[in-house]
């Protein structure tokens, strides 16, 4: 997943270097944080030693929090050398609530926002009666479970939660025992925030067990490995809630096509595009690449992106954006770009305007004087 996203940043840097409103040149430094908060802190030091004033990270809210903590200290102690953090995929709501920071801007929709959109879709499906939760045992997985129960109770109090499993992150090799529990529970739907091998192997186990009467509602169905695991067997029964899908019209379309040609891989992290378009617009407005000036410009900024008009909310630096619920189907019609050469893709079934998924914030932002 991380390798794919590094390539996405490098590829889009090349694209934006060809032409951008600010006339700046982007250079990407890739450092492996090994999914560890400790490694992240030393990776951040290394990036800053190499002169980076903007850092991007996304996989894991633990590492994201490590960056926020380190930058709060670094920026306070080193005026004139401030560093800005663009978070493209770490979705723990705390990062823009109790742990919010002036130096952190989130480009993905957080766990609670995605659950608002997903449950708005699910509440209107009469066949959804019994839901099973399976998630990774760390902050993100805990949040998916918590918000699923809280928000569904508000919208469809009759829905029963018949299972709530947490498993170690990226360690389970065989999900058959979990699938057996799902089968035994009588669930008609599974909600999971799993990503990477934890989603790919979960879906594979469901296919192997012939679990054909259960729909899976995912956050990360399009991410590396999962499309291949789903294949034709999962068509029509896996859904995804996300700010994008593979077949968006507009500026992202050609980029996705060109990326696939170049790498024989999918560019599924659209927030990388958000990052470049938002920064170039802010650089052009401020006529500067100084993170202090740019941060002030980003607050409350509205810009057109691939999923409509988006806004970087000033109170907590959480991007307000439209979300799609899409369904794993055979490619065809308007939806010709497939995932991982499977001949299948996530086809949008519903688009929700930003207000539907918007959630309040408890952020008490400390702004630099």
Predicted regions and their residues:
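Short, polar/charged alpha-helical segment
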Residues: 2-22, 147-154
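Extracellular/periplasmic Venus flytrap/periplasmic-binding protein
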Residues: 38-42, 94, 102-209, 244-254
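Extracytoplasmic "Venus flytrap"
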Residues: 1-10, 31-37, 59-60, 134-143, ...
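Extracellular/periplasmic periplasmic-binding protein-like sensory domains
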Residues: 101, 203-275, 281-289, 338-368
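Periplasmic-binding protein-like
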Residues: 47-61, 78-88, 130-135, 186-196, ...
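Beta-alpha junction/loop-to-helix N-cap segments that form part of ligand/metal-binding clefts
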Residues: 3-7, 19-95, 107, 167-175, ...
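Solvent-exposed, acidic/polar segments of extracytosolic/periplasmic ligand-binding ectodomains
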Residues: 302, 306-369
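Short, charged, surface-exposed loops that flank catalytic or proteolytic processing sites
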Residues: 22, 284-297
């Amino acid at each position: 997943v991380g390798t794919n996203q590094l390539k996405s940043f490098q590829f889009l840097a090349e694209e934006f270097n060809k032409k951008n409103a600010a006339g700046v040149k982007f250079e990407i430094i890739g450092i492996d944080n090994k999914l560890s908060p400790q490694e992240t802190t030393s990776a951040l030091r290394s990036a800053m030693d190499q002169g980076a004033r903007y850092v991007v990270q996304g996989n894991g809210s633990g590492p994201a929090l490590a960056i926020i903590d380190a930058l709060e200290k670094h920026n306070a102690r080193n005026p004139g050398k401030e560093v800005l953090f663009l978070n493209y995929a770490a979705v723990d709501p705390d990062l823009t609530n109790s742990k919010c920071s002036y130096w952190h801007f989130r480009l993905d929709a957080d766990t609670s926002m995605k659950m608002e959109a997903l449950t708005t879709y699910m509440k209107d499906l009469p066949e959804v009666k019994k839901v099973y939760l399976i998630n990774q045992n760390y902050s993100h997985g805990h949040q998916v479970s918590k918000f699923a129960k809280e928000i569904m109770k508000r919208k469809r109090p009759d829905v029963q939660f018949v299972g709530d499993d947490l498993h170690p992150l990226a360690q389970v090799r065989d999900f058959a025992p979990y699938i057996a529990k799902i089968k035994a529970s009588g669930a008609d739907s599974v909600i999971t925030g799993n990503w990477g091998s934890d989603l790919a192997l979960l879906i594979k186990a469901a296919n192997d067990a012939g679990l054909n009467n259960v729909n899976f509602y995912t956050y990360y169905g399009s991410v590396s490995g999962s499309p291949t695991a789903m294949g034709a067997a999962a068509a029509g029964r896996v859904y995804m809630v996300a700010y994008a899908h593979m077949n968006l019209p507009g500026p992202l379309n050609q980029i996705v096509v060109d990326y696939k040609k170049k790498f024989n891989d999918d560019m599924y992290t659209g927030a990388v595009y958000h990052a470049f378009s938002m920064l170039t617009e802010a650089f052009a407005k401020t006529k500067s690449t100084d993170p202090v000036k740019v941060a002030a410009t980003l607050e409350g900024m509205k810009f057109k992106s691939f999923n409509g008009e988006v806004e970087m909310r000033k109170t907590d630096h959480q991007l307000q954006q439209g979300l799609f619920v899409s369904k794993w189907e055979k490619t065809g019609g308007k939806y010709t770009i497939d995932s991982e050469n499977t001949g299948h893709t996530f086809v949008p079934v519903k688009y929700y305007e930003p207000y539907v998924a918007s959630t309040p914030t408890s952020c008490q932002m400390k702004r630099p004087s």
